[in-house]
């Protein structure tokens, strides 16, 4: 058997063993995709014992390409919501998550200085303790740039594997500890979260208002400032028994019922100006109007603003809401359409069908992957990651590397959505498949390289000490920030659990947090809010630590 065939066969065996290990769960918690690392260690141990030689160049390529696939697909997935998560609504959550990252770096620096832990080992412990695989890849690359011998770079994967198990368990123990210390009633926390959403800025809501302000009588909708803003959409108007789709030029009269869509604060402000909120239904049922959701798939409308498409003037149809990457938005006239956007249309059936034809509404296109943008994005990401950033006093130029470059480029492209006929939308199933493939390839190679010396290091070397260092790096930041967030910020427990899981970019921890309450989405929401920024910082942190420690040493 050729070296290439043998290498591929061994990698396939690693993936099978590792995924089987990952599926084993104890009390609902398992290693998940991280099991591939341990599958690689097991197979690597026996491969080393048997004296089998694998293709080093091929393993190196597969490891790096797997990492690129993984971080690129993550960036494409979270890109549309990344910049929104940095705004005020998620600022507090992101600040606490950043504090966890910074504290983890400080604890790592202190341990490195006090116990003189070798640089590759301490970076591996750091990456494993925070359960972040791209951090491992970024750390290994910067070590190679610094001229570290290959055998020492491979030690990083071994120390990563030592610290990884408690990284998984430590965050779950922290969630349990917070619940115990503060005697949390999970059901009550879920209800509080739902109440805060209803009163906050997080959800798009509707309100039916009767026009009672005499100053608005016989005024056009476009002449009423609160209705002519991009914060409120008036999607239906009922006069006597007639329900209609209003246009900017529609004259409103006292007694008209307006169906408004927007965020709760803006709706409340509109109600103060217009009149009184009423419970009267403005349903399209039994009328010649209907409400339908259509998806944007036509390349000709990508990047165009809603106002430039003139749907109201041409078809008598109003876009009441816009759903992008799972986030409900007010369909402001300045909003540009992106591939995969879901539009909530209100109008007559024939008119809605006409608008659906304009925007595409081809559901099958959502299941197709444009491969050209994928490779353009990966290529640009690798180029971005290769740009050297010279910092005075540092021995080598900093780079975003093969982990950071594709991630940043994917975040940007995911946010842009499309350029001409190229669109960076990727069906969730395809994104997940590429992401899982990438991380399996990466972890399989890391495990194989670490497996030869793993058992000896654990039983006869410093393996137990590495595990102890990892416990400190995992536990101190999580417990400290958890206490601060709960005591001083009065953070909701479910939100706190999601934030802690997101700060460790740890899907098993998110699964555990989601299972705390069957119906609440609090944990998933806070996880998604902090995940993009934390992932970026987790990739940059080991590079900064490596360069700083190298300069100090």
UniProtKB/Swiss-Prot annotation:
Q: Which GO terms describe its molecular function?
A: monoatomic cation transmembrane transporter activity
- A cellular component annotation (GO) from this entry: plasma membrane
Q: Which Pfam families match?
A: Asp-Al_Ex, TrkA_C
Entry annotated with the keyword ATP-binding: no
Which compartment or compartments is the protein found in? Cell membrane
Q: Provide the membrane topology annotation.
A: Multi-pass membrane protein
Report the Gene3D superfamilies cross-referenced here: Regulator of K+ conductance, C-terminal domain
Tell me which InterPro entries the record gives. Answer: AAE_transporter, RCK_C, RCK_C_sf, Transpt_YidE_put, YidE_YbjL
Report domain RCK C-terminal positions: 192-276, 279-361
What are the protein's UniProt keywords?
A: Cell membrane, Membrane, Repeat, Transmembrane, Transmembrane helix, Transport
Give GO BP annotations, semicolon-separated. potassium ion transport
Reply yes or no: does the keyword Transmembrane helix apply.
Answer: yes
Which NCBIfam families does the record match to this protein? PRK03818.1 (NF003007), YidE_YbjL_dupl (TIGR01625)
The record's comment on protein family reads: Belongs to the AAE transporter (TC 2.A.81) family. YidE subfamily.
What name goes with this protein?
Putative transport protein YidE
Source species: Salmonella typhimurium (strain LT2 / SGSC1412 / ATCC 700720)
